[in-house]
UniProtKB/Swiss-Prot annotation:
It catalyses: L-lysyl-[protein] + S-adenosyl-L-methionine = N(6)-methyl-L-lysyl-[protein] + S-adenosyl-L-homocysteine + H(+); N(6)-methyl-L-lysyl-[protein] + S-adenosyl-L-methionine = N(6),N(6)-dimethyl-L-lysyl-[protein] + S-adenosyl-L-homocysteine + H(+); N(6),N(6)-dimethyl-L-lysyl-[protein] + S-adenosyl-L-methionine = N(6),N(6),N(6)-trimethyl-L-lysyl-[protein] + S-adenosyl-L-homocysteine + H(+). S-adenosyl-L-methionine binds at W26, Y30, W41, G66, D88, Y89, D113, V114, K130. This is EEF1A lysine methyltransferase 4. Belongs to the methyltransferase superfamily. PANTHER family: EEF1A LYSINE METHYLTRANSFERASE 4, SAM-DEPENDENT METHYLTRANSFERASE SUPERFAMILY PROTEIN. Protein-lysine methyltransferase that efficiently catalyzes three successive methylations on 'Lys-36' in eukaryotic translation elongation factor 1 alpha (EEF1A1 or EEF1A2). The modification Phosphotyrosine is found at Y39. InterPro entries: Lys/N-term_MeTrsfase_sf, Methyltransf_11, SAM-dependent_MTases_sf. CDD domains: AdoMet_MTases. Its EC number is 2.1.1.-. Gene3D superfamilies: Vaccinia Virus protein VP39 (3.40.50.150). It holds the Pfam family Methyltransf_11.
Length: 255
């Protein structure tokens, strides 16, 4: 059974990439979300299901960060994972999702800033994010040199994720950002998790990071994490990806 949907029209794009970080842009973009179909960043559930499901248990308490109008939470419910809480800082889209999935009472929708989540510590077994960090870093002028503000923003989110996970919990991040950009953010010992990376494809080549709370990072990962405010060495042929022909902000946030 597929999620309820109508044909998806091209989204309203911002004039500048940094506007992806502004709630006003998302409120405007989602003003008709209750009547429009889901929009999926970095592939739909089917494209990464084989990677995600082995990390989940039916009884897991799952938190989805920056849910937007994605069908991910509903697809998790259909896949046998009913206990899903989804947050977004746009009250417009949260209200729309509450209406769209009112027939599924186990799905909860909350308006929250992912940098300061209003849940007790240890509330979740799994935290998922798909493109949320990418959007929060949109507008960074140089993907090889993340600003101190950008580093702080990511740290705020990851610190909250670590706080909310139970021992043995999993944080899963789906993104356009390759390891040479993203590992240095994730590989911080204070988060108390291990880190594994793989890829999946949905027309484009995307990255899938899995972190297990209570396990250790490798020595090489810790070394990369120590370089968080320095520039990584660029690969021989950097490849900047787009999520679609319309949304090209990813070319500026390979982080």
């Amino acid at each position: 059974m597929a999620s309820p949907r109508t044909p998806v029209s091209p989204p309203e794009l911002p004039e500048k990439n940094f506007q992806y970080r502004q709630v006003q842009y998302w409120d405007q973009r989602y003003k008709d979300a209750a009547d429009s179909g889901p929009y999926e960043w970095f592939g739909d559930f089917a494209s990464f299901r084989a990677l995600l499901e082995p990390e989940l248990c039916p009884e897991d308490r799952i938190l989805v960060l920056g849910c937007g109008n994605s069908a991910l939470s509903y697809e998790l419910f259909l896949g046998g994972f009913p206990n899903v809480t989804s947050v977004d800082y746009s009250p417009v889209v949260v209200a729309a999702m509450q209406v769209r999935y009112a027939h599924v009472p186990s799905l909860r929708w909350e308006t929250m800033d992912v940098r300061a989540l209003d849940f007790p510590s240890g509330s979740f077994d799994v935290v998922l994010e798909k493109g949320t960090l990418d959007a929060m870093l949109a507008g960074e002028p140089d993907p090889w040199n993340v600003s101190s503000e950008g580093v702080h923003t990511v740290d705020q989110v990851l610190s909250e994720v670590s706080r909310l996970l139970v021992p043995g919990g999993r944080f899963i991040s789906m993104t356009s950002a390759g390891p040479h950009f993203r590992i240095r953010h994730y590989a911080q010992s204070r988060y108390d998790w291990s880190l594994r990376h793989t890829t999946y494809s949905s027309g484009f080549h995307f990255h899938f990071y899995i972190m297990h709370k209570g396990r250790a990072l490798s020595v090489s990962q810790l070394a990369l994490g120590a370089q968080i405010l320095s520039s990584p060495s660029p690969p021989a042929s950097p490849c900047f990806l787009q999520d679609s022909d319309n949304e090209d902000f990813l070319s500026a946030i390979q982080l």
